Amino acid sequence: MTSTKFETKPLFTRQQLTALLLPLIAEQALSVTIGLADTLMVSSVGEAAVSGVSLVDTFNTLMIQIMTALATGGAVVASQYIGHREEKSARAAAAQIMFIMSSFSVLVAAVVVVGRHAILRGIFGSIDADVMKYAETYFLLSALSYPFIGLYNAGAALFRAQGNSKISMMSSLVMNVVNIGGNAILIFGFKMGVMGAALASLVSRAVACCAVLFLLQKPGCMLRVTGLSAMKPDGKLIRRILRVGIPAGIENGMFQIGKLSVASLTSTLGTAAIAANAVANTTSTFLNIPAIAVGMAVLTVVGQCLGAGEKEQAVWYARRLLLVAYCGAWVMNLSAFFFADRWALSWFSLSPEASAMALEVMMWFNIVSLFFWPSSFTLPNILRAAGDASFTMTVSIVSMWVFRVGFCYLWVLKMGGGLLSIWMGMYLDWAFRSICFMVRFVRGKWLEQKVI
């Protein structure tokens, strides 16, 4: 990517972009693969235990998404300061995101520890006593891990902002290996069940968090956070971070709530549809790995370009990286459509009815993803890197409630649609988002935003 002529020196070489992207792809592949293995190990505990863990993980996912969004705000601000050659301000932004994340995660953890029973009752209503018992146990230990998750996410985002994605990849590897090893020992060795699974997650997150914090304090780190003294609140920097982080957090939070609404609708379609939907969700996650990795990379690349005042380079790299995301989507989805979908289904013990539904949904996913997934999910990160987070939030929330939720309920409850109707509502959501984001990108409105 160095062949294009700019008026100034290109900020990124092809080798630098490759070095940024490949670890991110490996990190995502690792996370998805080991996450599946983790789910299978926990499922050996029993149906009530799995139900309890599943309920809590719904809330955990919401919290992780919000913390990831806050970390994104810090990464965008730090990236732009790096591009502007203001390393002192970049380090100050790094310290502020650590302050924001630690404060938020400790507050949420305290609320959950004290009120976990009321929270579970309030969200999920009346559930069986044995499921509630397992859920409360898992919720307690999950809450204790929130500060570790938050600080790990912030630290990993800061390393990516520097263009160093190897650190987050290796930290993720360590975290997942410790988690799987802990599950094996505590669940199968000591027969600790849900408590063992929760302890393994807590320890793995603590280890990864400590590793990232240690590396952030090394003298050679550009975004070095020297200690608590550096984390003194700075209102100006906090506002800049939250200007990106809050809209992204609201967007992610609403997205999870929308998914819950659709999940409850899926449950009305019967056991076969529930099983088919679960399998389709699991397998489709693998197909998004390259585009997700590109979406993480553009925060660094576009952020640094705009921080340096190089709008021309920001647009050029954004287009090339979006093309890379599309190439990844085409390779993964065409391979799945012609070869892998049926093979993947053979890994699951599904009834013929559920297998047929899952295959239909998966093949439609392959087709629609070719055109809409990268522009619906990778492209908005380009806009966020410029500070255009309020626009992406507005579009995403409107699209989700109108298409992903509204159309799904209309088609299923009023028109008698099945599982494919629910997924078609999701595809309409993608199409609408893609059109809005592409128009915003082409018109250049996103380049008018100011972060620093």
Ranges and model annotations:
Residues 8-40, 44-45, 61-73, 77, ...:
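N-terminal transmembrane alpha-helices
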Residues 62-65, 179-183, 209-213, 286-289, ...:
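Hydrophobic transmembrane alpha-helices of multi-pass small-molecule transporters
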Residues 47-58, 135, 139, 198, ...:
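Small-residue hotspots at the loop-to-helix junctions and early N-terminal turns
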Residues 50-110, 149-168, 274-340, 373-395:
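Small-residue-rich hydrophobic transmembrane alpha-helices
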